[in-house]
């Protein structure tokens, strides 16, 4: 029986491989679904410099795997923000968003940021 940790690791590796070739042709900020089941939701996001993702929220915590790292500003709908420095090939933990808040991801660097996001559907 596959443990949840092994499953997430396997899923992450598969998403990384599937998304890598696609990233080479992306010309705008985009979010592309990769996989979803009752346990996880996985997508790839490519965020171009100064071309933020629309306001959105995350009900569940998530792991960010940086395919192409950079400096990401996460700004909520009240204007508060935090800066994340993501290194290529590294994974990062982000908690779920506080109730009733929205945020947007803004690449404040000079090169596209590409990440795989693994959102844990059963965690709060």
Where are these regions (language model features)?
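A short glycine-rich, His/Asp/Glu-containing loop-to-beta-strand
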Residues: 29-54, 59-64, 115-118
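Glycine- and acidic-residue-biased ligand/ion/polar-headgroup-sensing regions
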Residues: 58-78
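Bacterial N-terminal signal peptides that target proteins for export
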Residues: 1-11
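Boundary at the C-terminal end of the N-terminal hydrophobic targeting segment
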Residues: 21-23
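Short acidic-glycine-tyrosine-enriched beta hairpin
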Residues: 36-39, 79-97
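Histidine-centered metal-chelating micro-motifs
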Residues: 50-54, 90-105
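Ligand-binding loop in jelly-roll beta-barrel domains
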Residues: 98-121
């Amino acid at each position: 029986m596959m443990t949840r940790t092994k499953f997430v690791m396997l899923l992450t590796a598969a998403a990384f491989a599937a998304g890598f070739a696609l990233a080479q042709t992306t010309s705008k900020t985009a979010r592309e679904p990769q996989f979803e089941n009752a346990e996880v939701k996985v997508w790839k996001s490519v965020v171009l410099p100064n071309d933020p993702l629309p306001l959105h929220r995350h009900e569940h915590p998530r792991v960010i795997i940086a395919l192409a790292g950079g400096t990401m500003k996460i700004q909520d709908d009240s204007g508060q923000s935090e800066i994340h420095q993501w290194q290529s090939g590294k994974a990062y933990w982000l908690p779920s968003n506080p109730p009733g808040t929205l945020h947007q991801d803004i690449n404040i660097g000079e090169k596209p940021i590409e990440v795989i996001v693994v959102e844990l559907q059963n965690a709060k």
